[in-house]
Amino acid sequence: AYIASRNELRAQTIRGGSVAEKMCNLTKQVWYNTIYEERDSITDKYTRSGGVFHDDFNTSLSLLYAEDNTATVISGLQASRELVDGIMADLQNPPAEFAACYEAADSLYDAYCGLIDLAVSPSGSLKTYSENFSKYDEDLLKYYNKLEALIPSE
């Protein structure tokens, strides 16, 4: 059961992480394009009004996050987070032979939560947002792969 829960953790974090990654990339693109007045067929509906770029990137981000599709994505990410939280609760206090697995799972969980948080509620400057996004995105893949290597076959 413990190995099955670990495998479920890996599956859910990579699935949710992939959705969060797409949302973070779009957020970063909207943010950047507003500041640097870059036209783009994907972001123009958020970055411009009446053919003119918004003076404040927060206006653009507010338009992005007010969109129905974004609300659906955010809702899905929050549901994913609740599911992963439950899996992590099941994995606490591992048997001794799974201690290293649990450490990797905990690191995977931290990266996953960081990525979800950035996707759901962007904050900071474009620079810090981009740096945090890169770190969590890289860490998610690193610990996903590490956990795979540590999981013994059932």
Ranges and model annotations:
Residues 2-67, 97-154:
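C-terminal amphipathic alpha-helix
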Residues 69, 73-77:
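Extracellular/lumenal glycan-associated context and N-glycosylation machinery
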Residues 77-99:
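Amphipathic, heptad-repeat alpha-helical segments
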